[in-house]
């Protein structure tokens, strides 16, 4: 049964018990956020007795996507736009009976680990640069782009003599981001020791992707010759924010006009434990089978790597106290 967006009004007068419910979800801009999640459409279908749910995130083409079903508690599937259109048109011609089979596999004993690399400095203070190493599908943007920037920074700073590196640089490919950000959660839980001497943390995640647009005349996704703007985050003083924004501007790193309320992505688990900086963007290609190298511009990788290197160089001229955020004015402004 087709229920459109899956709002309460879409379900009015419809008996979905024992049926496959089809939901059309609007991308905002894609899998990272879409209307079915915002309005609990899958959960609503399950509560009203649906046997299964299939929804389409309306990205033109036939994208495979990875997205959570929410709290539907019934078998839930995603369909590409072409497949959903074919099924809907078949329903328009008459009743359609479907046979649904969900095949899953459980694997035991799998392990992952954060991998560390260290460039010693001349003091006991350090800067942590991180990038998660797990991905869905091909993972070019998410997160080979971040990994490449981190490795580029490691290569660049390795060519600077240790005697000229004020602070130790610790590089870490964090584990289990798509399973609860286990690597950064560990850093948060062990911050009293693992981050005791850390003056800055930088997260490299989804840093470069081709800007795309929905065509105004047809259901087509069109690539541009530009790079998507990035969401950004700074936990620290006004001086640190000025350094970060100045570095991004110097190297042409496009960003949103205002800062995020928190560091989304892998850094979220530890975003306020130490002064921190992040760029991240979750485009229409995010968590889809179209997240391939072709949509990751080299120029964007280079710009972000140069920006982060500039931030590190400037931070290394300052004491940690200069980088710290102001203390909360009252308990109401403290982190929950």
Sequence positions of predicted segments:
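Mature extracellular/periplasmic domains of secretome proteins
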Residues: 11-16, 40-51, 67-70, 118, ...
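Metal-dependent peptidase/peptidase-like ectodomains
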Residues: 84, 122-124, 174-278
């Amino acid at each position: 049964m087709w229920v459109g967006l899956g709002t309460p009004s879409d379900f009015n007068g419809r008996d979905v018990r024992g049926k496959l419910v089809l939901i059309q979800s609007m991308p905002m801009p894609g899998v990272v956020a879409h209307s079915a999640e915002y309005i609990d459409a899958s959960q609503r279908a399950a509560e009203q007795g649906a046997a299964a749910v299939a929804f389409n995130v309306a990205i033109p083409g036939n994208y495979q996507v990875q997205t959570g079903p929410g709290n539907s508690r019934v078998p839930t599937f995603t369909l590409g736009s072409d497949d959903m259109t074919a099924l809907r048109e078949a329903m328009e011609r008459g009743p359609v009976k479907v046979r649904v089979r969900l095949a899953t596999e459980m694997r035991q004993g799998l392990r992952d680990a954060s991998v560390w690399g260290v460039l010693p400095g001349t003091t006991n203070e350090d800067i942590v640069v991180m990038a998660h190493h797990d991905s869905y599908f091909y993972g070019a943007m998410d997160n080979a782009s971040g990994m490449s920037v981190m490795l580029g920074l490691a290569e660049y700073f390795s060519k600077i003599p240790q005697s000229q590196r004020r602070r130790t640089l610790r590089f870490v490919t964090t584990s289990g981001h798509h399973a609860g950000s286990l690597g950064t959660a560990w850093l948060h839980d062990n911050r009293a020791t693992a981050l005791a001497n850390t003056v800055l943390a930088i997260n490299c995640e989804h840093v470069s992707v081709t800007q795309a647009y929905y065509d105004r005349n047809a259901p087509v996704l069109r690539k541009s010759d530009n790079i998507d703007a990035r969401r950004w985050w700074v936990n620290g003083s006004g001086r640190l924010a000025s350094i970060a924004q100045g570095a991004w501007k110097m190297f042409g790193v496009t960003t949103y006009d205002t800062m995020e309320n928190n560091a989304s992505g892998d850094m979220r688990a530890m975003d306020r434990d130490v002064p921190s900086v992040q760029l991240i963007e979750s485009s229409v290609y995010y968590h889809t089978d179209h997240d391939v190298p072709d949509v990751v511009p080299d120029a964007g990788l280079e710009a972000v790597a140069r920006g982060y290197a500039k931030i590190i160089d400037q931070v290394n001229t300052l004491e940690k106290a200069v980088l710290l955020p102001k203390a909360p004015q009252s308990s109401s402004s403290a982190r929950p």
